[in-house]
């Protein structure tokens, strides 16, 4: 959940200058191919139990709008589907406002549930037996036994913990309520260090040279600008910091398959090579009247997937572009689509 009812003011939408292709209606009974599928995480609205996961087949453009319900006798996910991860033949669907993680098998049928969480955000396996879960309110990171799907401990970390990545047996975690990225020893579950990365750091990726890129959205009320920070994961030295103009709030940092090109949202989709020395001035894909809310890069063909929340009430539009910024296809998903998982 991105707290859109706090962070955004709904404005009057103007018609886009370029008319998009017609949007096909999703079908629940469709033919799927053997190609790699795309899962779309749909938050739904707050407390409305309309969270869902949509399935898209890029080879024939087939859509199953509510795939989890389709595979589980119309069972509801809960309130605010936040993220989706895949590990050891299991899918882990993090349901933020319902305080749980739903576990599914390869057929997306529910096989278990992880409970006892405050307000979970993201799931990260750190070994074959253990995973970490970040949390909005708990002031800690949850430790999960993957054999039993039970919380077995926690790591104290004040603030709103968010995205996590792992490298060199270290877990790097962003914190929306602190100015720092925290480093955790994944063997003994202790915080060992921290690095300044700016206000409201949320998304991060690891490039081809094992550098960590952290995107902080900034805080306008304290005149703290957004920034993109490049950190050496081995020695934790700050290699480069890019500072955005005051008033900008970039988010949703992504990386392509070769890990040499960054993408992010900033009222449009922007692209940055990991060797660039300054931020791009022009968007690769302009938002126009659209409300870009989620972003993903398909590692199988480099296509750019964008979720348009429209008005946070209607079902989201999903737009697919190639790397030249040309629109290839669009379709409907669930309410407030916020991200993508790509099969590989």
Predicted regions located by residue number:
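Predominantly soluble domains enriched in secretory-pathway, periplasmic, or organellar proteins
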Residues: 18-344
């Amino acid at each position: 959940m991105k707290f859109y009812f706090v962070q955004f003011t709904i404005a009057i939408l103007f018609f886009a200058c370029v008319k998009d292709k017609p949007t096909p209606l999703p079908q629940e009974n469709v033919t799927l191919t053997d190609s790699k599928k795309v899962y779309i995480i749909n938050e739904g609205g707050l407390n409305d139990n309309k969270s869902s996961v949509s399935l898209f087949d890029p080879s024939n453009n087939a859509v199953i709008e509510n795939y989890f319900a389709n595979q589980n006798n119309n069972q509801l996910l809960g309130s605010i589907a936040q993220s989706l991860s895949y590990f050891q033949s299991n899918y882990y669907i993090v349901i933020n406002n319902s305080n749980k993680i739903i576990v599914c098998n390869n057929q997306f049928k529910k096989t278990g549930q992880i409970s006892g969480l405050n307000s979970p955000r993201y799931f990260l396996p750190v070994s074959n037996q253990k995973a970490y879960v970040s949390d909005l309110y708990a002031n800690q990171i949850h430790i999960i036994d993957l054999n039993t799907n039970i919380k077995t401990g926690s790591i104290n970390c004040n603030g709103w913990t968010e995205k996590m990545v792992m490298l060199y047996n270290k877990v790097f975690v962003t914190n929306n309520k602190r100015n720092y990225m925290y480093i955790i020893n994944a063997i003994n579950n202790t915080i060992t260090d921290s690095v300044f990365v700016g206000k409201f750091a949320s998304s991060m990726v690891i490039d081809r040279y094992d550098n960590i890129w952290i995107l902080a959205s900034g805080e306008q009320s304290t005149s703290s600008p957004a920034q993109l920070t490049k950190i050496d994961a081995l020695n934790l030295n700050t290699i480069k910091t890019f500072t955005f103009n005051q008033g900008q709030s970039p988010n949703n940092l992504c990386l392509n398959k070769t890990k040499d090109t960054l993408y992010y949202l900033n009222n449009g989709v922007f692209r940055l090579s990991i060797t660039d020395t300054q931020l791009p001035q022009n968007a690769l894909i302009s938002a126009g009247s659209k409300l870009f809310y989620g972003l993903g890069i398909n590692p199988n063909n480099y296509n750019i997937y964008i979720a348009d929340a429209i008005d946070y009430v209607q079902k989201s539009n999903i737009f697919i572009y190639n790397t030249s910024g040309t629109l290839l296809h669009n379709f409907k998903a669930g309410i407030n689509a916020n991200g993508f998982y790509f099969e590989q």
